[in-house]
Amino acid sequence: DADVIGLPGIHIECKWVERLNIREAMEQSMNDAKEKEMPTVFHKKNRQPWLVTMTMDDWMKLYKAAGKLL
């Protein structure tokens, strides 16, 4: 199951750790994502801003969809 809900079409794996193996975290998100959900990892370190990792293909899909709204 996703760690965070409320963003339709996006599967969120959430990590708050000082050391993160991002490839393992993405693999977990990809394995847990339902069909048609974009696997993502939202991650942060203490006293640092949140970052989001996703595949380039999924990022381009979001970018193109957002461009249609502008």
Regions found by a protein language model. Give the residues of each.
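Catalytic centers of nucleases
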Residues: 1-32
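Domain-level recognition of nuclease-like catalytic cores that cleave nucleotide substrates
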Residues: 38-70
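Solvent-exposed, well-ordered amphipathic alpha-helical segments
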Residues: 5-11, 32-39, 65-70
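Mid-chain, well-packed structural core segment of small domains
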Residues: 20-50
